[in-house]
């Protein structure tokens, strides 16, 4: 049935839908592909289409199959549909059809394709001859089982020692191991199972190596790509020749160029390159120098001389790419090697087939399935042996009135085959509705095949007369005009079918549709010129991180967010900002930069989990328990905070027996040495006993219980919770425990297997990801990868890391894989022990390079289209010469030349190369896209502000003002006038506790806790009971709904007053009341306190303090530090002599410390209320208050005296009483 326009209802004037959206909702009668650009409302359209099929066409919801990409999107889709059905039912309560839908929605097939396949298998398991009580394998189980399968298969082939297998191992294994060989087998496994017929795909891999016609096709493909570079080289050489021809005394240069012109003319004549000429060509070792004589003869033409030489250098680099990448060997050699490689490739394919079969058997024996089994078993149910739809498939065809597929660009060929089995009709009369955007296809690493979308996009038409119907949703309801028009301009000159795999034409571009006001927010393209190592101690990446922090500050201080619903502005907050990068490689630098600037920052990284200190500690423990003969992990455990062996102690142990193979042997030998330090021997005895205890425990208990025992025995959770970032550290430790629980629920058991599982994850670079401890509404700046940002939107997007090179590492592998073309293997001469490129490896390497750049372009598109208000692009260069080079990228018609795009090294080359051209006044017309951008229409007119910043200019040293916060981290930068004191303070506050703490005692206590403990002990209370309470009690943050709507409690007002006092400026000209109000307003602007806090701040009490003598004494002090944290050893503070006494690490926070004439004072603020009993004098009240805080103040004073090695005085300041001096 054809789509008839009359079948689509007339669109009323008052509906919100665009014409294209309206058509997408109501069109039917054939397969429909909706190309939905970013922000075009595709989800809303999909939901509305489902609803209208139910309401208008009386289709039951359970007769629609809706396929989404994730379980989360499936749940959201189902919820939206259910809500709309309920709304319709309330409006028409007597409608029986709607009443039925409210029941049937619970059986509706709105799910991922994997979920649909699983349901299919559960209903038709008899066709597969499998046990119906199967379960889904865990990640750990699947990884280990595949590894074990590869072990078994390779072992079988090692036993056979087939000559071709020997050649493969010689080529793909190293002298030490066969890791690379195994990795290639795994890659081939995953590539093959992404096809409907894995064995058939594998069997075809050797065909190009055998069949001459396929080799000729590969030669033509290489020729076409090489010709692009050779012609570009010819143009560069011609430009060089033209410039040198205008000059004097350059005969030698012209002679060289003339020789090269003869060569390249001969190489590119005809349609086929002369490969013999190219392979045999040799350049002059050095181009004739442009000496002073030439410069004198061409006075005033220095720039032209340099430009002529640059064109020649560019020509040479282009020819060298062709020579090295495409024709390092002549055509005859390339084809001859293919014949010799054929049996080797066939044997490799056979190994992978053996792995697939054996892996299937292993899974069957355990009665488990993985996600690829879901797809292949479903396909087995839906197809006959000849590939035609089965009887079961026919029943599903009859059942489903329509199949709707979201994110169609991310499907693979197996999924495409499944859909084709259950859809009805052909494309011209089918019932398949597909929504997606190929410009956002960024999952090639998961075997997503964007060519499926592209093929349909090119085949379907907007009229739908010949095949399927194509509808373009191009209107964007997310972003401001500046974001859209700049994105359009960039991609119109960067993306086409040659590089990008799709033409960015009028249908593909974005059109402004959001109801923003007319305030201009141009895209910022920021180029950061690095400071040299002479001018900065920071690396380029660290400089960029600091630069990004400055952009965030600028947004917070100057930008507003427009609410499209109300038409009002609000101030920008941290949660409005996201930093997007290609990967998490810059995460650590950004975390440090934001931490240094006290800006809340969160990165939910999928990388770096195994690098976290707390995780490394536990893994060292597990590896040591499994095998203590691993020196790195054993010593790491000994040096850890748990056992605290010093470097001196480790050296002392090693010196006794320096020739031992393992450090564990050295420990044993030291313990029996007559001259050994008895104290160290005792310490080692306790350590060895611990190891043996845990080894015995691990023999009978699962891994997660071993981890739990380690946590409890040594208070690991409590210790790491007390450090900076304690929430995240605690979550990471629990995350590792949970992974161990999941592992034990698989068919694998034991410590060794768990460690192997972890090692495999690390080798695959497949992290768990740091545990997420931040909610969606938390006011923090977020960093995420472009992949994880897909589908999200943010008012402000900082797209950084643009200068990071594209990852082309896979292109250098000895085996190149391509889903469409197959396998390209280098030729390895076993006798010469040398590898050479083969015809297939050269061709597939070139194809993969092109596809890689295309996917990187799509990633750029996704990043740019996340922004609502403003987009900030950040790239980094060594010097401004690089920027000039980018501006001068060659232009071919309306695009950056193909050769420039294929050789681009990073996104910044492309982005800056396009957007900077129209703003470069000196650029010749042949390097521009247009002479005047004002002639462009609004949809493609770039609105971009280009800023070039030198790091030296934007990185001013932090100036310490009287009213700034002094923290431990800033002590290095503060000039106290007493360097010895400063060094001692820093060393003591950063001190690593060297002695083993009794593991049954808390590892860390606050001064307040010690105060309670000592008060309790003085009352003869049992210590263990107090410790149990202190460790076990939960400390929860007060929920926001309580703090926002209820009157503040006394402790909250106390915290608020401390925050105000922490930032209070001290100056000899006292603050006035108006200035105090202005200061509080600044704290609200900086979000240090809530806006409604003003009414709870006791202004009069603070003014009383400001007008008092203590304020003036502090204002006149030599140095002032506020909110100074400390972590010290209780032994040092209390003067204890034995490490076996009840000791802990003490932590606390001193409100203020100041120094006057060499004397240090501390001040502790108190907001306590007190009862003045009748007849009590001020002196009596003061004594009562001092007695109440005597223990706490004693610890503060002793702590500071321990650190500073000098007497310290202190004050208690009560806002409701006044100043009390601490007694000696």
Curated annotation (Swiss-Prot):
The keyword Cytoplasm does not apply. Disulfide bonds: none annotated. GO terms for molecular function: 3'-5' DNA helicase activity; 3'-5' exonuclease activity; ATP binding; ATP hydrolysis activity; double-stranded DNA binding. Its EC number is 3.1.-.-, 5.6.2.4. Keywords: ATP-binding, DNA damage, DNA repair, DNA-binding, Exonuclease, Helicase, Hydrolase, Isomerase, Nuclease, Nucleotide-binding. Residues 15-480 form the UvrD-like helicase ATP-binding domain. GO terms for biological process: double-strand break repair via homologous recombination. It comes from the Bacteria. It catalyses: Couples ATP hydrolysis with the unwinding of duplex DNA by translocating in the 3'-5' direction; ATP + H2O = ADP + phosphate + H(+). Its cofactor is Mg(2+). ATP binds at residues 36-43. One of its GO terms (cellular component) is DNA helicase complex. Residues 497-791 form the UvrD-like helicase C-terminal domain. Belongs to the helicase family. AddA subfamily. Heterodimer of AddA and AddB/RexB. The heterodimer acts as both an ATP-dependent DNA helicase and an ATP-dependent, dual-direction single-stranded exonuclease. Recognizes the chi site generating a DNA molecule suitable for the initiation of homologous recombination. The AddA nuclease domain is required for chi fragment generation; this subunit has the helicase and 3' -> 5' nuclease activities. This is ATP-dependent helicase/nuclease subunit A. It comes from Staphylococcus epidermidis (strain ATCC 12228 / FDA PCI 1200). The lineage of its organism: Bacteria, Bacillati, Bacillota, Bacilli, Bacillales. The gene is addA.
């Amino acid at each position: 049935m054809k789509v008839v326009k009359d079948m689509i209802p007339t669109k009323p004037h008052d509906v919100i839908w665009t014409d294209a959206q309206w058509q997408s909702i109501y069109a039917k009668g054939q397969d429909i592909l909706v190309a939905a650009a970013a922000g075009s409302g595709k989800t809303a359209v999909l939901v509305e289409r489902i609803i209208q099929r139910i309401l208008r066409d009386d289709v039951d919801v359970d007769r629609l199959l809706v396929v989404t990409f994730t379980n989360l999107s499936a749940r959201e889709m189902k919820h939206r549909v259910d809500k709309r059905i309920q709304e319709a039912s309330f409006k028409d309560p007597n409608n029986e059809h709607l009443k039925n839908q409210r029941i049937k929605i619970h059986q509706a097939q709105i799910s991922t394709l994997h979920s649909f396949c699983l349901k299919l298998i559960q209903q038709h398991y008899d066709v597969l001859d499998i046990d119906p009580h199967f379960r889904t394998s865990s990640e750990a189980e699947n990884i280990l089982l595949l590894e074990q399968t590869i072990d078994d298969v390779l072992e079988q082939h090692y036993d056979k020692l087939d000559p071709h297998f020997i050649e493969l191992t010689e080529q793909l294994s190293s002298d030490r191991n066969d890791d690379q060989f195994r990795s290639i087998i795994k890659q081939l496994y995953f590539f093959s199972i992404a096809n409907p017929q894995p064995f058939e795909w594998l069997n075809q891999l050797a065909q190009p190596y055998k069949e001459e016609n396929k080799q000729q096709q590969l030669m033509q493909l290489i020729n076409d790509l090489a010709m692009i570079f050779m012609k570009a080289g010819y143009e560069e050489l011609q430009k060089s020749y033209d410039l040198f021809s205008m000059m004097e005394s350059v005969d030698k240069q012209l002679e060289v160029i003339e020789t090269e012109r003869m060569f390249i003319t001969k190489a590119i004549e005809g349609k086929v390159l002369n490969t013999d000429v190219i392979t045999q060509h040799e350049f002059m070792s050095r181009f004739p120098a442009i000496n002073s004589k030439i410069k004198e003869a061409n006075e005033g033409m220095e720039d032209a001389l340099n430009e002529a030489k640059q064109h020649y250098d560019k020509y040479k680099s282009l020819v060298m790419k062709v020579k090295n990448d495409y024709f390092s060997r002549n055509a005859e050699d390339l084809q001859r090697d293919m014949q010799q490689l054929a049996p080797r490739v066939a044997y490799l394919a056979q190994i992978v087939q053996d792995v697939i079969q054996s892996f299937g058997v292993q899974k069957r024996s355990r009665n488990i399935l993985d996600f690829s089994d879901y797809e292949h078993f479903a396909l087995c149910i839906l197809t006959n042996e000849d590939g035609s739809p089965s009887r079961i498939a026919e029943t599903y065809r009859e059942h489903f009135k329509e199949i709707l597929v979201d994110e169609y660009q991310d499907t693979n060929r197996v999924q495409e085959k499944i859909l084709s089995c259950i859809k009805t009709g052909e494309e011209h009369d089918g019932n398949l509705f597909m929504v997606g955007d190929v410009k956002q296809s960024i999952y090639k690493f998961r075997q997503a095949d964007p060519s499926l979308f592209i093929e349909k996009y090119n085949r379907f038409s907007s009229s739908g007369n010949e095949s399927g119907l194509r509808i373009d949703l191009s209107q964007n309801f997310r972003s401001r005009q500046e974001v859209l028009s700049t994105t359009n301009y960039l991609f119109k000159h960067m993306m086409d079918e040659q590089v990008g795999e799709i033409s960015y034409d009028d249908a593909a571009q974005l059109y402004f549709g959001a109801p923003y006001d007319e305030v201009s927010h141009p895209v910022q393209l920021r180029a950061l010129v690095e400071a040299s190592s002479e001018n900065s101690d920071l690396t380029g990446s660290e400089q960029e991180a600091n630069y990004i922090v400055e952009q965030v500050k600028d947004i917070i201080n100057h930008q507003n967010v427009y609410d499209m619903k109300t038409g009002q502005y609000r101030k920008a907050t941290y949660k409005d900002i996201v930093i997007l990068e290609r990967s998490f490689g810059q995460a650590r630098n950004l975390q440090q930069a934001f931490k240094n600037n006290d800006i809340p920052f969160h990165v939910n990284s999928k990388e770096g989990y195994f690098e976290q200190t707390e995780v490394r500690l536990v893994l060292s423990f597990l590896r040591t328990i499994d095998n203590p003969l691993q020196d790195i992990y054993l010593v790491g455990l000994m040096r850890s905070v748990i056992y605290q062996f010093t470097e001196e102690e480790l050296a002392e142990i090693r010196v006794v027996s320096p020739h031992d193979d393992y450090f564990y042997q050295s420990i044993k030998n030291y313990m029996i040495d007559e001259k050994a330090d008895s104290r160290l021997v005792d310490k080692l005895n306790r350590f060895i006993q611990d190891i043996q205890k845990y080894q015995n425990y691990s023999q009978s208990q699962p891994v997660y219980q071993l981890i739990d025992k380690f946590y409890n025995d040594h208070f690991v959770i409590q210790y790491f919770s007390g450090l900076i970032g304690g929430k995240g550290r605690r979550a990471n430790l629990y995350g590792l425990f949970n992974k161990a629980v999941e592992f034990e629920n698989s068919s694998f058991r034991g410590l060794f297997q768990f460690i192997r599982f972890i090692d495999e994850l690390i080798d695959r670079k497949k992290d768990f990801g740091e545990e997420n401890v931040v909610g969606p509404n938390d006011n923090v700046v977020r960093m995420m990868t472009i992949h994880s940002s897909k589908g999200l939107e943010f008012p402000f997007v900082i797209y950084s890391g643009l200068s990071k090179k594209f990852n082309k590492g896979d292109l250098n592998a000895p085996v190149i894989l391509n889903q469409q073309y197959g396998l390209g293997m280098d030729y390895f001469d076993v006798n010469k022990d040398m590898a050479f490129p083969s015809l297939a490896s050269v061709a597939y390497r070139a194809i993969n390079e092109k596809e890689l750049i295309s996917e990187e372009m799509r990633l750029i598109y996704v990043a740019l289209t996340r922004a609502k208000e403003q987009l900030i692009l950040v790239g980094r260069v060594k010097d401004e010469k690089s920027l000039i080079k980018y501006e001068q990228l060659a232009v071919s018609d309306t695009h950056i030349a193909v050769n420039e795009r294929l050789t681009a090294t990073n996104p910044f080359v492309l982005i800056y190369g396009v957007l900077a051209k129209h703003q470069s006044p000196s650029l010749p017309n042949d390097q521009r896209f247009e002479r005047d951008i004002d002639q462009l229409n609004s949809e493609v007119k770039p609105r971009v502000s280009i800023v070039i910043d030198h790091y030296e200019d934007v990185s001013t040293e932090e100036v310490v003002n009287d009213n700034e916060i002094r923290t431990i981290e800033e002590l290095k930068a503060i000039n106290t006038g007493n360097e010895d004191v400063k060094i001692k303070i820093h060393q003591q506050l950063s001190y690593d506790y060297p002695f083993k703490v009794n593991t049954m005692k808390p590892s860390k206590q606050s001064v307040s806790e010690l105060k309670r403990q000592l008060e309790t002990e003085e009352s003869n209370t049992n210590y263990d009971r107090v410790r149990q309470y202190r460790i076990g009690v939960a400390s929860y943050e007060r929920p926001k709904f309580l703090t926002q709507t209820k009157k503040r409690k006394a402790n909250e007002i106390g915290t608020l007053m401390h925050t105000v006092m922490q930032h209070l400026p001290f100056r000899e000209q006292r603050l006035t009341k108006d200035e105090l109000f202005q200061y509080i307003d600044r704290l609200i602007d900086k979000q240090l306190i809530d806006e409604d806090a003003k009414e709870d701040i006791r202004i009069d009490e603070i003014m009383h303090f400001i007008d008092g003598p203590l304020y003036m004494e502090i204002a006149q002090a030599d140095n002032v530090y506020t909110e100074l944290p400390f972590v010290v050893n209780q032994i040092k503070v209390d003067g204890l002599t034995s490490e076996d006494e009840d000791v802990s690490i003490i932590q606390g926070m001193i409100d203020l410390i100041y120094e006057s004439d060499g004397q240090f004072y501390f001040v502790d603020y108190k907001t306590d209320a007190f009862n003045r009993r009748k007849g009590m004098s001020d002196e009596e009240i003061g004594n009562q208050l001092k007695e109440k805080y005597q223990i706490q103040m004693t610890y503060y004073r002793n702590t500071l005296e321990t650190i500073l090695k000098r007497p310290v005085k202190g004050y208690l300041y009560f806002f409701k009483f006044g100043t009390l001096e601490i007694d000696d």
